[in-house]
């Protein structure tokens, strides 16, 4: 990974995002700290009388300079942008290996993640890491959720394959758990006489999905322990539960931004909104 974009503002969550990016960036990586400012709108008009844009820009410049100076990391480059924070981050993310954002996490998952995080998740094609939960440390143990959606031949067009390959590239990873969860209400409830046999078949099919994705992802990096987890339950719930003991959860998304995948995909959005650990959404 050579380019990591981080959204920076005055929140504690933003500071956690920047620290997370520094922990996972190789020594030769560029960490682009983006701080966006804009003139607030009041009733549809710029509050030109009460707010001086030059003062806003000066304050934003000073803030960003102080943040980078306090860190003292030569890999961090400050970028000041004027405009909508989400759009500014999407533009800065061009060619990046990932975008890292902090999530404030209040109320109903902060009403679908918060406007900036939600915008970036839906409009960039780059992997997005949402820093949430109580653990912001190095991602030593990573859970990668996989499914059988995508290309039949297991090529890189399969979102799960891309997600696993991305996890392989993450600096400092020691253990990766590849998880596939399945849920068939009628089978799980034992409605059919053959429910027991059907569940065994579903378990075997889940194990095959995991093997299929792992084969397509190619060789894993040396020094990384790989485990397979076939779980009974809805994918979102299973991954959220797994996040309790994980440092990072990685999910693939079939969306390409905008309305190409409504609300990003139910599992990706559910995990990003409710995980107990940071979440990476990989396109």
Question: Where in this protein do the model-derived segments appear?
Answer:
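A short acidic, glycine-rich active-site loop
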Residues: 50-62, 196-208
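Active-site-adjacent scaffolding segments
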Residues: 82-131
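Glycine-rich, Arg-bearing micro-motifs that act as flexible, cationic patches
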Residues: 101-119, 138-139, 151, 251-274
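General small-molecule cofactor/ligand-binding pocket signal
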Residues: 32-34, 77-81, 129, 177-179, ...
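Structural beta-alpha unit
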Residues: 3, 13, 51-54, 69-99, ...
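Small/aliphatic-rich secondary-structure junction motif
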Residues: 1-50, 141-196, 215, 219-221, ...
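Flexible loop/hinge segments that line or gate small-molecule binding clefts
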Residues: 132-138
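Protein-protein interaction modules outside structured cores
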Residues: 205-208, 227-241, 245-283
């Amino acid at each position: 990974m050579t380019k990591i974009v981080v959204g920076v503002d005055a929140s504690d969550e933003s500071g956690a995002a920047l620290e997370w990016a520094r922990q996972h960036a190789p020594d030769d990586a560029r960490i682009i700290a983006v701080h966006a400012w804009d003139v607030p709108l009041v009733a549809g008009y710029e509050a030109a009388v009460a707010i001086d844009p030059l003062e806003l820009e000066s304050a934003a410049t000073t803030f960003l300079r102080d943040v980078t100076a306090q860190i003292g990391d030569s890999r961090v480059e400050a970028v000041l942008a004027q405009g909508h924070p989400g759009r500014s981050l999407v533009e800065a993310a061009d060619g990046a290996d990932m975008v890292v954002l902090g999530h404030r996490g209040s109320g109903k998952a902060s009403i679908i993640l918060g406007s900036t995080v939600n915008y970036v998740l839906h409009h960039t094609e780059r992997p997005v890491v949402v820093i949430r939960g109580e653990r912001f440390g190095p991602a030593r143990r990573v859970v990668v959720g996989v499914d059988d959606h995508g290309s039949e031949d297991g090529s890189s067009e399969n979102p799960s394959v891309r997600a696993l390959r991305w996890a392989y590239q993450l600096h400092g990873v020691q253990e990766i758990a590849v998880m596939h969860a399945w849920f068939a209400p009628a089978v799980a409830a034992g409605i059919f006489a053959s429910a027991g046999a059907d569940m065994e078949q579903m378990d075997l099919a889940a194990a095959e999905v995991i093997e299929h994705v792992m084969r397509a992802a190619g060789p894993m990096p040396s020094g990384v322990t790989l485990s397979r987890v076939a779980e009974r339950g809805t994918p979102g719930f299973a991954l959220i539960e797994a996040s309790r003991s994980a440092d990072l959860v990685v999910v693939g998304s079939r969306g390409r931004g905008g309305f190409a995948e409504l609300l990003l995909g139910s599992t990706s959005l559910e995990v990003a909104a409710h995980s107990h650990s940071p979440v990476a959404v990989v396109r």
